[in-house]
């Protein structure tokens, strides 16, 4: 009885061994990408562990080229191909953070741009520029020019500034201050009317247009204009008849005829406003 069981167990064991070898061969053929563990696999895992260890020490260090190890499966060999994974070129251009020095603040230029403003009691206050000190020669030349005219045109101001060796702005400011001072002195009565400069007969600091308006006509032209105005007024008063005589047409024609003949302009004006009355036979006889 035991011999029968032993023979059955031996048969089952012999049948199981080919089937297991068949299954192992079939599985290896189904997945050819999974190579059999060889000595190269052990070296691959060893190199990978060493690279991981180096990467933990220097995360951005130089990485060597990674080479894929091929293996022959069922007599088919795969060519090896290397991949360059070095990141040293891309990270070398970026330096460590915070090492580059920041550009210095140009406080000197800011002080030069705004030298006239400073803080006084917590409030900004402009510092006045130093006053221009003129020499005696410059003051005498400016005063002489001010006696001639109180206002300077742009070419005159440029010429005066060039002759005195000052800027045009300084000449303009000096004339402004001098006009203001002269106006105050004239209002207070410190300056008599005979010492007024030329062009300021009516009031000090008058504009050039107002001062030159009185120079357009000479004294003889003013006198002639006044006599013409008085003659015109007298002629108008003489030519106007009384209300009593205005009813008669013969008085108007006889009285106004000599005057109208002497002045043709007045004759045209008179004929335009007062046409001559028709002469009838009753007035002649």
Swiss-Prot record:
GO terms for molecular function: DNA-binding transcription factor activity, RNA polymerase II-specific; RNA polymerase II cis-regulatory region sequence-specific DNA binding. Residues 17-47, 96-115, 188-238 are annotated as: Disordered. GO terms for biological process: angiogenesis; cell differentiation; embryonic skeletal system development; negative regulation of transcription by RNA polymerase II; regulation of transcription by RNA polymerase II; ventral spinal cord interneuron fate commitment; visual perception. It is found in: Nucleus. CDD domains: homeodomain. Residues 127-186 bind DNA. Expression restricted to anterior ectodermal derivatives, namely the ventral forebrain, the cranial neural crest and the cement gland. Also expressed in the developing eye. Residues 200-214 have a biased composition (Low complexity). GO terms for cellular component: nucleus. Keywords: Angiogenesis, Developmental protein, Differentiation, DNA-binding, Homeobox, Neurogenesis, Nucleus, Sensory transduction, Vision. Its main location: nucleus. InterPro entries: Distal-less_Homeobox_TF, Distal-less_N, HD, HD_metazoa, Homeobox_CS, Homeodomain-like_sf, HTH_motif. Transmembrane segments: none annotated. Residues 30-47 have a biased composition (Polar residues). PROSITE patterns: HOMEOBOX_1, HOMEOBOX_2. Belongs to the distal-less homeobox family. Involved in the Notch signaling pathway as Notch ligand. Activates NOTCH1 and NOTCH4. Involved in angiogenesis; negatively regulates endothelial cell proliferation and migration and angiogenic sprouting. Essential for retinal progenitor proliferation is required for suppressing rod fates in late retinal progenitors as well as for proper generation of other retinal cell types. During spinal cord neurogenesis, inhibits V2a interneuron fate. PANTHER family: HOMEOBOX PROTEIN (PTHR24327), HOMEOBOX PROTEIN DLX-2 (PTHR24327:SF23). This is Homeobox protein DLL-4. It comes from Xenopus laevis (African clawed frog). The lineage of its organism: Eukaryota, Metazoa, Chordata, Craniata, Vertebrata.
């Amino acid at each position: 009885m035991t011999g029968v069981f032993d023979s059955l167990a031996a048969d089952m064991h012999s049948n199981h061994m080919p089937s297991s070898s068949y299954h192992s061969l079939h599985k290896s053929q189904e997945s050819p990408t999974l190579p059999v563990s060889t000595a190269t696999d052990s070296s691959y895992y060893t190199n990978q562990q060493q690279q991981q260890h180096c990467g933990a020490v220097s995360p951005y260090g130089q990485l060597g080229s990674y080479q894929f190890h091929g293996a022959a499966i069922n007599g088919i060999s795969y060519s090896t191909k290397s991949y360059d994974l070095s990141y040293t070129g891309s990270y070398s251009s970026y330096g460590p953070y915070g090492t580059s020095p920041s550009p210095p603040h140009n406080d000197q230029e800011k002080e030069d741009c705004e030298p006239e403003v400073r803080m006084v009691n917590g409030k900004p206050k402009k510092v006045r520029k130093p006053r221009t000190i003129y020499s005696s020669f410059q003051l005498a030349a400016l005063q002489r020019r001010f006696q001639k005219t109180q206002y300077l045109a742009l070419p005159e101001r440029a010429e005066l500034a060039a002759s005195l060796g000052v800027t045009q702005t300084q000449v303009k400011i000096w004339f402004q201050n001098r006009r203001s001072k002269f106006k105050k002195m004239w209002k207070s009565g410190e300056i008599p009317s005979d010492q007024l400069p030329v062009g300021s007969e009516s009031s000090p600091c008058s504009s050039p247009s107002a001062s030159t308006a009185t120079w357009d006509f000479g004294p003889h032209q003013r006198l002639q204009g006044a006599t013409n105005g008085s003659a015109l007024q007298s002629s108008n008063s003489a030519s106007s008849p009384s209300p009593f005589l205005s009813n008669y047409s013969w008085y108007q024609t006889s009285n106004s005829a000599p005057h109208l003949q002497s002045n043709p302009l007045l004759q045209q004006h008179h004929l335009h406003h007062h046409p001559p009355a028709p002469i009838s036979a009753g007035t002649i006889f």
